[in-house]
Amino acid sequence: MMKLQKRFLLLSALVATSLVACNNAKPEPQPQVDNTHVDVFVLSGQSNMEGSTYYVHPNGTELLKNYFEEEGMDYEPVAEGIPTVKTSYYGFYYPNGWAQAHTASPDTSSPEARMTPNFQPTKVGMGVGDTVQGKKDIFFGPELGLANTIAEAASEENPVHLIKCAFSGSGFTKTDGANWTKRDEDPTKSLFYLLKTYTYNCLHAIEETGKVPVLKGFLWHQGESDGGDAKYEDYTRTLVGDFREEFKSYAVDEDPDKIAFIDCTIYDGKGTSKMSYGTAANNAKLKIGNESEDDLNFCINANHEEGGLGLEIGDDSKGGYNTYHYNTPDAYKLGKAYGEIILNNNLLRDK
């Protein structure tokens, strides 16, 4: 199948947001296996994938609702839940190290208990479980914009399932256990083990409902922790290859290369929080996303300096909790960008 290179310009008079992707293919539509087939996408990475953006500020400001109203969008579906796209999520935020995180996750004293799948209509509040100023579950991640973008292409009878397993502060080169390179069968040493285990748990839960899960894509957002590492490209290729091989039995035709990989560049804008060290990661992401017209590797270009979406981070008053996290409108746009790649490349079954 041949990829088509497309680029969307940001014209505020015409569109609310734009998608600038490293490549934007148009493969043949995915086959409709039968009425038991449901599409599945796995979302993983670190805090901006886990969801570290306010939808409502601790001071009570309805940041996401206000953004929707400004853009003339209906807020009710994302507030009440999108029934055609269900999400189950697992992860934790650990500012003080892996050991503490693994023994004291935000929602329960047993992190393993949180690995029980719980698919719900996608809505606000599916971000980090951290409590800020006494307020809890006030965060969201890319799952929201993604779900709202593909909602009408799915159905309540055969909803798209999103499996989100992401860990704040994690990286390929971390030494405290929060490491994506290790393949130990030990949850205290390997994030890939946790990702693998949770993904299987969720796939089996779908099967128990009588549906047949078909894994269509692996969505990644990571690099803030180790974006300057010269081996970032190698680490990424290994991760994607291992993921595809691990879950090939759930791929279309059991072909691992039919599991799409959708990445995103990390922040490169100006300001005190500029992640200038992320150049190596962004170069790797763009290279992997652009190198072939025949694969299913994609990359959202979120950059400022490379003519991308120009997504902003770190403005607390605009929802960017802490230094490195997307502002509220930008976190939604990021999810929308993932969703548009899925739609533009026919990665969904006929509903």
Model regions and ranges:
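C-terminal motif of bacterial Sec signal peptides marking the signal peptidase cleavage site
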Residues: 18-21
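Cell-envelope and extracellular/periplasmic
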Residues: 28-351
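Sec-dependent N-terminal signal peptides
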Residues: 8-16
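Bacterial N-terminal signal peptides that target proteins for export
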Residues: 1-9
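Bacterial signal peptide processing site
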Residues: 23-25
